[in-house]
Curated annotation (Swiss-Prot):
Enzyme class: hydrolase
Provenance organism: Escherichia coli O157:H7
Keyword Nuclease part of the UniProt annotation: yes
Gene of this entry: rpnD
Annotated function: A low activity DNA endonuclease probably yielding 3'-hydroxyl ends. Involved in RecA-independent recombination and horizontal gene transfer.
Protein name: Recombination-promoting nuclease RpnD
Alphabetized UniProt keyword annotations: DNA recombination, Endonuclease, Hydrolase, Magnesium, Nuclease
InterPro entries hit by this protein: Rpn/YhgA-like_nuclease, RpnA, Transposase_31
EC number, UniProt record: 3.1.21.-
Molecular function as annotated in GO: double-stranded DNA endonuclease activity
One GO-annotated biological process of the protein: DNA recombination
Protein family membership: Belongs to the Rpn/YhgA-like nuclease family.
Length: 260
């Protein structure tokens, strides 16, 4: 008799059946929605490890995970079958987490691989009937309408590489960050002096942010021209010369200690 490490006898019985390929094939042929079933080559069923570890290193475990080839033979589909003897208001979100974990593992060894379809299925036989909760995870939000707009569309993108500099300098306290990170790969940042002076004069960054900014330029930009860059910057804004030179000297000393 096969032993399963499970929390309940319900789980043990469920696994003893659904981990058998012929039984799993019958289950999917009967219960998978027709349009999804037609995508799957159920003769290619392969049992996969259903244990995962998420980013916080906590065990994430689903009951049963099968992979199948597509009928076109150009990819894989995974079917997650979760067993529940009690209803769970957040079951849909839990199934989404399982699905994301399967997708992550699929692309771990080759980031260029397309994401696989993962079909989550819930087998329920609890005392409360019918199953009382939606299995659309978007319904779990307090505002499902906004959740659908957010998660069914492309996410907001701030592509600073296509934003004109004249527009960036109007972005108040985030302008320095955006301007430098847009142009850092030029290596020579001397052409940005005029715009940087305007932003620094308006006190759009505190000492901590200016320190981080200059350190970033030293580490990522043209190190050989850093002193020239600082000299030109301070010559354009003599009222801030002492402040900037103090920060630059501290960065230089820290860099020397790190390299000694």
């Amino acid at each position: 008799m096969t032993n399963f490490t499970t929390s309940t006898p319900h789980d043990a019985l469920f696994k003893s059946f659904l981990m058998h390929p012929d039984t799993a094939r019958d289950f999917m042929e009967i219960h998978l929605p027709k349009d999804l079933r037609e995508l799957c080559d159920l003769d290619s069923l392969k049992l996969e490890s259903a244990s995962f570890v998420d980013e916080k290193l906590r065990a994430l475990h689903s009951d049963i995970l099968w992979s199948v080839k597509t009928r076109e033979g150009d990819g894989y589909i995974y079917v997650v079958i979760e067993h529940q003897s009690r209803e769970d208001i957040h079951m849909a979100f839990r199934l989404m987490r399982y699905s994301m974990a399967v997708m992550q593992r699929h692309i771990e060894h080759d980031k260029r691989r397309p994401l696989p379809l993962v079909i989550p299925m819930l087998f329920y036989h609890g005392s409360r009937s019918p199953y009382p909760w939606s299995l659309c995870w978007l319904d779990e939000f307090a505002d499902p309408t906004t959740a659908r707009k957010l998660y069914n569309a492309a996410f907001p993108l701030v592509d600073i590489t296509v934003v004109p500099d004249d527009e960036i300098v109007q972005h108040r306290r985030v302008a320095l960050l955006e301007l430098i990170q847009k142009h850092i790969r030029q290596r020579d940042l001397m052409g940005l002096i005029d715009q940087l002076v305007v932003l620094l004069v308006t006190e759009c960054a505190n000492d901590s942010q200016i320190t981080a900014l200059l350190n970033y330029i030293l580490l990522t930009g043209d190190e050989e021209r850093f002193n020239e860059f600082i000299s030109e910057l301070t010559s354009r804004m003599p009222q801030h010369r002492e402040r900037i030179m103090t920060i630059a000297e501290r960065i230089h000393n820290d860099d020397c200690r790190a390299n000694s």
